Amino acid sequence: VRIHPRRGDALSEKVRLEVLTTASRRDGVRLQIERTIEQNRKIFDFKLQELPHIESAITALQNGTGDLVAMSALDWRNLDVEGLSIVGILPRREPTWVLVSNDKPEYLCSKAVVVCDNELLRRQMRRLRSDLIILTSEQFAERIGKLDAYLNLDEEDRIHWIEECRQDKLLEGFVVSRGEHSALRFKSRRHTLGLQREKPERTHFVPPPLHGFTLLVSRTGFPSATVLPMFDPSAYLAHRIEAALLDSLPKEIHSLVGIFVEQRKFKTILKEAQRSNDDFTNDSFLDSNHAQGKVSGKNLTGSAKWERSVPKKGMSTSPRLEIKVETLNYAGTVTASAERVSTLEESHMSMVNVLKEFMNLLETMQLDHEEMVRKFPGLPEEYSLARPPLMDLHSVQASSSEEE
């Protein structure tokens, strides 16, 4: 880190930063760091140096070259980063994935072919539409007799090949991360596979963990206070919680679990609850004695009931941390999920509680149901019979559409 006086102001100091980066890795990092540098040029004197690949950038930083390396959260987990630490995290990009298709997923034709290389997203797509034919890229290439041609392509060219096949009507759509979509040569129509907070009647998609983060990494001991203006504390907290949750789960289910952590305003949560007629959330935060339905003596429900409500006495209106975790069986017919909203001060305990709830739920759903000796009047005899586990995460049972 070098410091220069600003021209015309000998008392001002401008921090010089050498940032190491790579060509686009289809994860959104390169584009975001370029925008961040442009937005902060009045504060910092940047030098952006491109290296051939992320491994060489990390090695250069470890050997004393440069000040910072911009990388994704997944690279941070998967590569050798000994001697380095996270200085800060840029504002999080949208982590949800997209369906590249002419139609929304609900309106795809029956038995439409959709390519997706992420196991979690494949299961979520089956939950939405059990009739869809969900294939990996290799399965699709083999299906149309072009597996060798596909395997001979460079990795960065394969997504373009899939898009060309879609334009040739060999498939109806494919699911990719937003970074991969932005790398397409032609920006085709996309549909967000999101949380659907404003439309709870639609199938939701909790994204794979740790997507959308751009980490700025430096050698341990770097004076992080000098670069604080670039960073987003809420993104740092979300990354810490998501990474801790993922590390606490069994490795064999990492590819099957969706995790999403976000800091949200108190008012935003309430407005959303009123739009979706979520009386549970409203009743948790608001004083029901001041709800319009009781003041006027009318039996109102939904948003009208809470129009004149106020937060409960002693209820903090500070931002909240929302945590969502889910997994599905192969066919997408059974989902195990846990979620919690807490204050930022209670974020660690909230994470611990969500983890306990999720693991207990998962364990219970994977147990065999023994035959019940006691009979319950009014219930069919089948109710007491022994049953297999409600959820089997690992058995691969092809759906009828794929068998055909």
PLM regions with names:
Residues 69, 113-116, 174:
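Short, hydrophobic beta-strand segments that form beta-sheet elements in well-ordered domains
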Residues 56-98:
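Short beta-strand-centered segments that line the small-molecule binding cleft or hinge
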Residues 99-114, 128, 132:
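Flexible hinge/capping segments at coil-to-helix
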Residues 104-108, 121, 221-227:
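Short helix-loop capping/hinge motifs at secondary-structure junctions, enriched
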Residues 65-66, 111, 171:
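Local beta-strand N-terminus motif with an aromatic residue
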Residues 75-76, 120-122, 180-181:
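Alpha-helix capping/helix-boundary segments
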Residues 2-55, 127-404:
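Small-molecule-sensing regulatory modules
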Residues 117-127:
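Secondary-structure junction motif
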